[in-house]
Amino acid sequence: MNVRLKRAKELMGYAVQLTKDEGLPTMVKRGAGFVRRRFFGKRARYLPGKKVLEAQTAEMVGKTAENCGLPTISILTPLYNTPENYLREFLGSFVNQTAPNGQLCLADASDDAHPEVERVVREYQWKNQRIVYKKVENKGIAANTNAAETLATGEYLALADHDDVLAPHAMYAMGKAVLQLREKGEPDSFLYSDEALFTKDIKKPMVGHFKPDYAPDYLLCCNYICHLAVFKRALYEQLGGERPECDGSQDHDLFLRLIEQTGGAAHLPQVLYYWRVHAGSTSGGTGAKPYVAAAAKKALTDHLSRTGRTGTVEDGLFPSTYRVKWDIEGDPKVSILIPNKDHADDLEKCLYSIWSKTEWDNFEVIVIENNSTDPATFAYYKDAEKRYEGLKVVTWPEKGFNFSAINNFGRKAAQGEYLLLLNNDVEVRNGDWLTELLRQCAHPGGAAICGAMLYYPDETLQHAGVVTGLGGYAGHSHKYKKAGGSGYLFRAATVQDFSAVTGACLLVRASVWDEVKGLDEKFAVAFNDVDFCLRVRDKGYRIVWTPYAQLTHYESKSRGGDEKDPVKAARFAAEQQRLYDVHGKADILDDPYYNPSLTHDREDFSESGDLRNLKEGKVTVRWRNA
């Protein structure tokens, strides 16, 4: 089916379902937002509405940092030859905060040719005595940040660059977020928000950076946290502040060291920081600052050493990204489970690619025969078992098709420490695909499940992880995107934390499979992989996806389409409802590795049509452990 037509059908299906669930007015409102965003450009400001900001200001009238009820946040900012217009905009964004719980700590290392930096700061100090300043020798950004910290009196610290802009509600929202965490009994030691890029006017941002909740594997591949990060001052001092030897990636290094102590982080999905894009800024890419990559690899290598893990840190697929090649513990055996009904030509393509390309040699393949009718299929099985050492065919004794039951049956014949669910209509592309899947799981602290990059034959993406809530239930990250792209915030080009991955290629520790009792056989065809991953996640295990294990997926040739068959359509609807019944509709629609400012209508990480959560300024913060 044509990709555009397929997208249109998916969108129409979601509109129909949304109308049923929430009514026509809601569907029309979201549809209007989608059309406005899609066809009339991105004019979203990401700011709360005027009345929301006015209400915050009114709440704080007559209050000071000491009696406003919010924790004080000291913002650390090194200054160096800052252009006057940028500096004024930055200082103005602090002065015009809706709450008084901020302190701005400035360490100025500007040279003698730029006396206007101090002059401008002194001017703004008359407007707000919460701005503190000291002149320092230029010892680099980390050392200068540490110098700014000596001025801090707040319980919390934040980091801001001298040429950026704070959202007007940044201090208010972060202060409220800390209180909310305390009310919930969750850790309040490290928080971060979303951000946006801009060039001249924050009311006309280029793009929003809408981040997932804390994602440890993603953080090892790039500093997705960036701004605005807030953390306890006592913890910063305990760690000795920022490390000058990591200048260029000092914040990434700091965040890794903080999380080693906190065990996680809290995410507030509000745009609280505007990152200016100009020549020389890291927001424009590390091409402007080549030393960043070396500093980042040092930060990551040191992090592995401190946490007792072994692996090699390499450059990633794109600048600003990195790859950890984990050392695999032992020589684990992998049992590859492949359900099959007829289509011997597809199966042969799959098996041949496994044996001809796979570099990891400790594996077995179990083909699970289910209700084939073509005599040639059974002749093929006998021939294949002779040609492929380590292949065995087992026969599922039931009738019909039940993906879950078939794989549960196949697991009984498996002897490996790891199980790999694999469709019969996939073809291996790179030799270390299985090694890479094992790298993500078979090391101390590794994930329980790892999924692969799957391509359609036309070189577009079929699977780069699963996001729950897309289309109302679940969808594939970056589906239909052209191969070779980085995706949204590098999310199609770096190892990622996800709530689920597709069962078309899914590696799982056998012990974890057994712990959750395998696949739920009430999900005969759809959502069995999503349900399985969610049950594993709920046990406290991690699910990741890697772009370095690549296969081509000739999707669902064996089963054919379900769209026009009323029996299959009814079964699909029942499985959709069961997904809600088992896991809760609210949780399905609130994937922690997605973001409420991103659309549920498409699989491309585009912005939501209405951005209600931003306009209403809702403070909903969530802590997530490593």
Task: Enumerate the language-model features and the residues they cover.
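Active-site donor/metal-binding and catalytic loop motifs
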Residues: 269-286, 316-322, 521, 541, ...
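A short, conserved alpha-helix in the catalytic core of glycosyltransferases
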Residues: 235, 245-271, 300, 433-438, ...
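Conserved donor NDP-sugar-binding/catalytic core segment of glycosyltransferases
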Residues: 169-206, 426-473
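C-terminal, non-catalytic tails of nucleotide-sugar-dependent glycosyltransferases
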Residues: 2, 6-68, 289-331, 458, ...
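Nucleotide-sugar donor-binding/catalytic module of glycosyltransferases
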Residues: 31, 35-288, 302
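Glycine-rich, basic loop-to-helix element that forms the pyrophosphate-binding segment
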Residues: 136-152, 396-414
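Short, acidic, metal-binding catalytic loop of nucleotide-sugar glycosyltransferases
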Residues: 92-101, 352-362
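Short beta-strand-to-loop acidic/aromatic patch adjacent to the donor-nucleotide binding site
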Residues: 154-165, 416-429
